[in-house]
Amino acid sequence: LTMNVLFVCSRNQWRSPTAERIWRRTPGLTARSAGTSRNAIKTVTPELLLWADMIFVMEQKHKNRLVAEHRRLLEHKPLHVLDIPDDYHYMDPELITLLEQSTEPFLAPFIKK
């Protein structure tokens, strides 16, 4: 069984694609990313939320927006706020460290050795 993990930021430009890239080749996980903004590279859709077993958002505002727009789809999904500000570029080493440290405790049980 594979755990489907969705990472969400605003524009799907720096933070969530970095998280997707970090975890996408991990056995036991399937990672995707999207943004809450209408002009995101990939915008969050109901289909993506249904697909996801676990959702990580970078900031509280992303959770607020998802809940406002998709409350019923999120009722029984684990949704974690990482509190990672929009201060980093794609694959920034500091961003990678923050993402790994904040998500690994939740993802470790699902990683296949």
Task: List the model feature ranges, each with a label.
Residues 1-54, 64, 101-113:
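Conserved active-site segments centered on acidic
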Residues 67-113:
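Phosphate-binding/catalytic loops
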